[in-house]
């Protein structure tokens, strides 16, 4: 553990410590409008209910809070706090929004400066394709075929908000800014409880999106920081003595005895002596840790993660949050796809002169499918169908024009197909397309007090073209006219689009209203 602390201090000493006296001065307004950071566009803060707050309001509120009379009145009259006065909800919400989002702008400034620290003459390579979350799946398809075990990690959440403040102390030296952060977090949670409630986290995430995103990303970066430390220490074990593990000592002695009896039999290093390469992939609060090692080694990694999180973050990680499975016998849910690596058996007939025989070939394949139940549940929550998948009309949209209704339904359908284009089986997608198409027709029929058949006959091909997805256009160009191909088949061609930067809202039911 002392070695980890030394490694942590060494890595963090390379970073420039951030000083934040600007938070309580008017220079925040000029600094946030620096041309190197944001160009000529002013900084706009998006709050709840799509409200916009300029950084000028942030500056004025900070100056007002910095005045002595404001805080004296708050101390002498705690029930009449101007910021947290629940009797005047508008000002309470307005001030907390401005100040919290203003704090998020300030703490993001050093990270923006770090991106501009490189010389202008040095060309910085841009990997725009790697910004897509779909770029993860080609990586998994290339690597997971050679791995054996898979660990599902759920980053512990929610946690005590004081831990978030303590993690920022590594980078923030300004004490008043940390007190201000505690002031906000105390407003949204019960400070005396060890674990905050999901209601407090939901309020903090909904009303202060920018601040919550920064705090959560800071916490995740620290979580991955000590995970990287464990990975580096694991890779260094091959250069040191293997006497730290009892089973390695026994195995080494057996191999030495075997080498005396059969000299020259083993000319190469056996993979058991080398810690396998670990692959780590994360999105939001879920992560995957895969390796080629043994089950015993994976259990050790699980123990390391639990113990380190208990020591470093001062909370207990439930062991069931880390699930260990064999890769070929399980499937994992990640980014809205149900992925697995099944073993397919292939019989090949080999003809040699007059003799022929069958060869049983076993091949691994990275398979990605779309789970039907969660998506139908999301459509049901959005009031497009019932819980069993029966399409219904959407009365909320009946006040819109016909073309707006068609455009909304068609856009949802195209977005679903676009996001799930990497599915090896399209049957679930066409079922969702049928639900959206019939729901659209029933919405239009309800608006005009008519029947569904009447509207289908009136619109004709125009109604179908709105639900004609981009992926189907690509497949129509790939296959010739002589090829018997049906869009409603179960073809396994997959397309990974590299322009998707976030998960689809229907994939994550928590984002739906």
UniProtKB/Swiss-Prot annotation:
Any one Gene Ontology BP term: mRNA processing
Keywords, ordered alphabetically: Chloroplast, mRNA processing, Plastid, RNA-binding, tRNA processing
GO CC annotation: chloroplast
Superkingdom field: Eukaryota
Record localization: Plastid, Chloroplast
Molecular function GO terms recorded: RNA binding
Keyword set includes Zinc: no
InterPro entries for the chain: Domain_X, Maturase_MatK, Maturase_MatK_N
Transmembrane segments: none
Pfam (any one): MatK_N
Major subcellular location class: plastid
Biological function: Usually encoded in the trnK tRNA gene intron. Probably assists in splicing its own and other chloroplast group II introns.
Similarity annotation: Belongs to the intron maturase 2 family. MatK subfamily.
Name recorded for this polypeptide: Maturase K
């Amino acid at each position: 553990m002392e070695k980890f602390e030394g490694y942590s201090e060494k890595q963090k000493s390379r970073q420039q410590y951030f000083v934040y006296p600007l938070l309580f001065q008017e220079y925040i307004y000029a600094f946030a409008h620096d041309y190197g950071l944001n160009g000529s566009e002013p900084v706009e803060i998006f709050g709840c209910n799509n409200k916009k707050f300029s950084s000028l309001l942030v500056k004025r509120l900070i100056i007002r809070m910095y005045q002595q009379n404001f805080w004296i009145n708050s101390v002498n009259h705690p029930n009449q706090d101007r910021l947290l006065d629940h009797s005047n909800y508008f000002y309470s919400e307005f001030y907390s929004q401005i100040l919290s989002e203003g704090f998020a702008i300030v703490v993001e400034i050093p990270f923006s400066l770090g991106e501009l620290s490189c010389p202008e003459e040095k060309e910085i390579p841009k990997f725009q394709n790697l910004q897509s979350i779909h770029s993860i799946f080609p990586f998994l398809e290339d690597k997971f075929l050679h791995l054996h075990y898979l660990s599902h990690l759920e980053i512990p959440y929610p946690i005590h908000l004081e831990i978030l403040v303590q993690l920022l102390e590594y980078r923030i030296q300004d004490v008043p800014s940390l007190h201000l952060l505690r002031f906000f977090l105390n407003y949204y949670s019960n400070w005396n409880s060890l674990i905050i409630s999901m209601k407090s986290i939901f309020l903090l995430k909904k009303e202060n999106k920018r601040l919550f995103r920064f705090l959560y990303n800071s916490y995740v970066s620290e979580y991955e920081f000590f995970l990287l430390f464990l990975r580096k220490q694991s890779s260094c074990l091959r250069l040191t003595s293997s006497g730290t593990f009892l089973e390695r000592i026994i195995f080494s002695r057996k191999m030495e005895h075997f080498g005396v009896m059969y000299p020259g039999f083993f000319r190469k290093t056996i993979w058991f002596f080398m810690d396998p390469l670990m692959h780590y992939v994360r999105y939001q609060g879920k992560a995957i840790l895969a390796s080629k090692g043994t089950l015993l080694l994976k259990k050790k990694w699980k123990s390391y993660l639990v113990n380190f999180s208990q020591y470093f973050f001062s909370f207990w990680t439930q062991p069931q949050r880390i699930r260990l499975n064999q890769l070929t016998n399980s499937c994992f849910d990640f980014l809205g796809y149900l992925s697995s690596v099944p073993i397919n058996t292939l019989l090949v007939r080999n003809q040699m002169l007059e003799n022929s025989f069958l060869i049983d070939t076993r091949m691994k394949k990275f398979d990605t499918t779309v789970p039907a139940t969660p998506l139908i549940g999301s459509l049901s929550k959005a009031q497009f169908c019932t819980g069993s998948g029966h399409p219904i009309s959407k009365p909320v949209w009946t006040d819109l024009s016909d073309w707006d209704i068609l455009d909304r339904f068609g856009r949802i359908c195209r977005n679903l197909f676009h996001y799930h284009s990497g599915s090896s089986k399209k049957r679930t997608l066409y079922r969702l397309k049928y639900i959206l198409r019939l729901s659209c027709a029933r919405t239009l029929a309800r608006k005009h007090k008519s029947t569904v058949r009447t509207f289908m006959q009136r619109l004709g091909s125009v109604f179908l073209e709105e639900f004609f997805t981009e992926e189907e256009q690509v497949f129509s160009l790939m296959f010739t006219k002589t090829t018997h191909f049906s869009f409603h088949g179960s073809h396994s061609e997959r397309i990974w689009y590299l322009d998707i930067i976030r998960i689809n809202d229907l994939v994550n039911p928590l984002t739906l209203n």
